[in-house]
Amino acid sequence: MQYAPAQFTSVSKTYGSIKALNDFDLTIQRGELVALLGSNGAGKTTAVRILLGLSRPTAGQIALFGSDPREAASRSRLGAVLQSARVPETLRVREHIHLFSSYYPAPLPMAQILEIAGLEGIERRKYGELSGGQQKRVLFALAICGNPDLLVLDEPTVGLDVTARRGLWKQIRAFVELGRSVLLTTHYLAEAEALADRVVVIDRGRAVATGTPAEIRGDAASLEDAFVELIAV
């Protein structure tokens, strides 16, 4: 039986009196890129932490390939780039990729990782010598070393200029074209519109709308206008 890469079923998460997720539902299908779109504090990072097994839901169920996210078998099929990701600045790009690849039984070939992540030509440079956009692409490369079936990207383009952001978009789409699934959290509406097969708008811990970017936009003048209307309800 084939299970969806990720499934949240009526998931809630409370921290004291704060409800970070509130009866949250989301299923990510194979081969699709889902953008979880919301303002700061909407619950995006909480959802990611629960999916990665770093936090447990207060109520509801979370499944990663049909299993508990804490199980090694399901985690081995997952890659992630978190906002807090840090790697040593003195290692070269190739050295980082070689090290991370050694953790997996069947990693992607070095050449393929460099090509997908757009790192060809800078693989011998030290991480600390790279621009912010290049460093983000290295973190993306490390997340795909294990050839994951599901990639989780938590606000991957925060702090990047427009050129670097669009460059990373290209690398993300290249990975999806391999038939993989991606969960992307973002508060950039242009990012969701450019990348996503499906957008889930989250507000105060609850999914308030889901659909293609065009469906979310509806009759509004722009996706931004539709988003503002949705979170104002």
Name the predicted role of every residue range:
Residues 60-74:
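Conserved ABC transporter NBD signature motif
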Residues 98, 102, 107-123:
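Conserved ABC ATPase "signature" region
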Residues 126-130:
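Conserved ABC ATPase signature
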Residues 151-155:
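Catalytic Walker B motif of ABC-type/P-loop ATPase nucleotide-binding domains
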Residues 210-211:
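ABC ATPase "signature
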